[in-house]
């Protein structure tokens, strides 16, 4: 995961100090890209231990179209707790936009189901896109989508994915986002009878929070370790049928976890 450390180093060297919504302050650059060949291993950061359980459960939660944190809490995942209301609701966030984007005629659009159908029917399409950024509903969301749009691309029997992340919390958020969309790519590839290709991460406002600098500098002193392998249950051919038990991470070795505060 040298690519990730290079991003962190780039922001430490070239970032501009900016105020932000949380009042914490950030060091930020605009526009950055990282590429990960999924044949070389699963891109889970090794220079600090990452909580894969949270990544998998959150992705499954998105794919079910869920916007209440009940499922997450039942599975020991607390990453959305700070934004939920007293009933656990988050408003029309990722899962709602992915699976139930409201159409003008009162019906809803299942972007994920449409995406799968299009990959199978017309893999050369340039419209293999899912958007979570719905301007009409942004104000109703507990937190507007940071990872706002992703596109798939099929070539030579391989499926690649590019994510556009408008707001990138480099220390805490980005390692999760890379792993989550890399995993989604593996899952979609399996159910569409394709091989995984590349995951490409494109960031807009890429920032380190002012209270994450010490942690980032510590992480930059660590040498990346070999990437692990992610194994999926080969029997699963329906994207919405995947369960937590269908994933096995093999060979994950990482440096110790580095604690850092979340900016809310």
From Swiss-Prot:
GO terms for cellular component: cytosol. Its EC number is 2.1.1.45. Its main location: cytoplasm. DUMP binds at residues 21, 126-127, 166-169, 177, 207-209. HAMAP family: Thymidy_synth_bact. NCBIfam families: PRK01827.1-3, PRK01827.1-5, thym_sym. Catalyzes the reductive methylation of 2'-deoxyuridine-5'-monophosphate (dUMP) to 2'-deoxythymidine-5'-monophosphate (dTMP) while utilizing 5,10-methylenetetrahydrofolate (mTHF) as the methyl donor and reductant in the reaction, yielding dihydrofolate (DHF) as a by-product. This enzymatic reaction provides an intracellular de novo source of dTMP, an essential precursor for DNA biosynthesis. This is Thymidylate synthase.
């Amino acid at each position: 995961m040298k690519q990730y450390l290079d991003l962190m180093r780039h922001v430490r060297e070239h970032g501009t100090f900016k105020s932000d919504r949380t009042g914490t302050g950030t060091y930020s650059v605009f526009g950055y890209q990282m590429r990960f060949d999924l044949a070389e291993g699963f891109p889970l950061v090794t220079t600090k231990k990452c909580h894969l359980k949270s990544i998998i459960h959150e992705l499954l939660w998105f794919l079910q179209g869920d916007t209440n944190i009940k499922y997450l809490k039942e599975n020991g995942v607390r990453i959305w707790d700070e934004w939920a209301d007293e009933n656990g609701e988050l408003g029309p966030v990722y899962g709602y936009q992915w699976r139930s984007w409201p159409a003008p005629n009162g019906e809803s659009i299942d972007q994920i189901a449409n995406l799968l159908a299009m990959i199978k029917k017309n893999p050369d399409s340039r419209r293999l896109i899912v958007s979570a950024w719905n301007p009409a509903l942004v104000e109703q969301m507990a937190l507007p989508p940071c990872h706002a749009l992703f596109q798939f691309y099929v070539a030579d029997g391989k499926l690649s994915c590019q994510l556009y992340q408008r707001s990138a919390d480099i220390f805490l958020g980005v390692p999760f986002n890379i792993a989550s969309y890399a995993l989604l790519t593996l899952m979609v590839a399996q159910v569409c009878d394709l091989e995984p290709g590349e995951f490409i991460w494109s960031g807009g406002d890429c920032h380190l929070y002012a209270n994450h600098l010490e942690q980032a500098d510590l992480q930059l002193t660590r040498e990346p370790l070999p990437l692990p392998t992610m194994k999926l249950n080969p029997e699963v051919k329906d994207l919405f049928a995947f369960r937590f038990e269908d994933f096995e991470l093999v060979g994950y070795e990482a440096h110790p976890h580095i604690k850092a505060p979340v900016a809310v």
